[in-house]
Amino acid sequence: MRVLVINSGSSSIKYQLIEMEGEKVLCKGIAERIGIEGSRLVHRVGDEKHVIERELPDHEEALKLILNTLVDEKLGVIKDLKEIDAVGHRVVHGGERFKESVLVDEEVLKAIEEVSPLAPLHNPANLMGIKAAMKLLPGVPNVAVFDTAFHQTIPQKAYLYAIPYEYYEKYKIRRYGFHGTSHRYVSKRAAEILGKKLEELKIITCHIGNGASVAAVKYGKCVDTSMGFTPLEGLVMGTRSGDLDPAIPFFIMEKEGISPQEMYDILNKKSGVYGLSKGFSSDMRDIEEAALKGDEWCKLVLEIYDYRIAKYIGAYAAAMNGVDAIVFTAGVGENSPITREDVCSYLEFLGVKLDKQKNEETIRGKEGIISTPDSRVKVLVVPTNEELMIARDTKEIVEKIGR
């Protein structure tokens, strides 16, 4: 079975074509700057990279170019579009309705649209990708895989906010959590590496990228996560503030005379590492490099960043009444021995012992255990693979309906 995985953003479509037998990526790429001047397709087959400059006014045109490239004589990897058996889509928000991945039909499309106010930047773009695929590949099943679904096992005590309950009833304001597909993939993979059953383990997964979140995965089910009603809550991120006294935005708005939308943009786009570093960078690589060269302010930014992660790990160890493994993933989690070492230095009370050499070596796509053999809690690095998880779900659902 061949599955086309699509991640449709507001001005881009990322894609991978995966041969499910052997789980091999045949090609991948991105159509970027959709609806903006300078749009193009970057298409990769193995180590080869091809760039096609083309005007892409909308998502349908972008997907059309992607599909044409897949069957192109020179650049293609298949002879006919009929070789695509199914399409798997990343959908950011499934609200309370979707607890697992689903086959897309008219009812599902309507439901995704209904929860769009909860993810106004993402869901409408995800929908455009689904609708384009349904139009351009008629008869091919489409599956929606939700970022929020894995977190739907979180109990009420962890997802309800201490605000008037009527706001939950009226507007469904609660903790939803994000990065669910990544947390699900790395917790499952960590159990495989440890040679244990996922259902027997208490795992804390740390998805640390430009956006970042921690999840408590108890016996295979998520019981808490750091992102909340939106992806703004929790850890210090590239440009997002993470946890904040709710009175602070009101105070700033009053003092600066700014609107709620402007305040929202500040918290989402100008805060986090970028805000703390006084606009120096939102990229942790730049912060680490400056800190290593002796920049005292960047050292402090690093400390704030790592301290918040460690605090959440400690909290989730308490939430699960113990922890067997801690997993680092995503851009920073997979490639920053500095952050991993600093975070783990706070966790010695849990019995965490890091193997310095393994920590230094496990970067750039490598996976493995980076704690010492006598560490009470195992620490792992697992490169995330959300596309593969989407493809697996798609295959499973399509096989069930016997397509």
UniProtKB/Swiss-Prot annotation:
Active-site residues per Swiss-Prot or TrEMBL entry: D147 (proton donor/acceptor)
Requisite cofactors: Mg(2+); Mn(2+)
UniProt-annotated binding residues for ATP: K14, H207, I208, G209, N210, G211, D283, M284, R285, G331, V332, G333, E334, N335
Site residues, Transition state stabilizer: H179, R240
Keyword entries, A-Z: ATP-binding, Cytoplasm, Kinase, Magnesium, Metal-binding, Nucleotide-binding, Transferase
Coiled coil: none
Subcellular locations according to the entry: Cytoplasm
EC number of the protein: 2.7.2.1
Annotated residues for binding of Mg(2+): N7, E386
CDD domains linked to this entry: ASKHA_NBD_AcK_PK
Superkingdom of origin organism: Bacteria
Broadest EC class assigned to this enzyme: transferase
Amino-acid positions noted as binding substrate in the UniProt annotation, renumbered to this chain: R90
Keyword Signal: no
Functional pathway: Metabolic intermediate biosynthesis; acetyl-CoA biosynthesis; acetyl-CoA from acetate: step 1/2
Gene Ontology cellular component list: cytoplasm
BP GO terms, sorted: acetate metabolic process; acetyl-CoA biosynthetic process
MF terms (GO), sorted A to Z: acetate kinase activity; ATP binding; magnesium ion binding
Reactions accelerated catalytically: acetate + ATP = acetyl phosphate + ADP
UniProt family annotation: Belongs to the acetokinase family.
Role this protein plays: Catalyzes the formation of acetyl phosphate from acetate and ATP. Can also catalyze the reverse reaction. Phosphorylates propionate (54%) in addition to acetate (100%). Uses GTP (100%), ITP (163%), UTP (56%), and CTP (21%) as phosphoryl donors in addition to ATP (100%).
Known partners and oligomeric status: Homodimer.
Protein's UniProt name: Acetate kinase
Native species: Thermotoga maritima (strain ATCC 43589 / DSM 3109 / JCM 10099 / NBRC 100826 / MSB8)
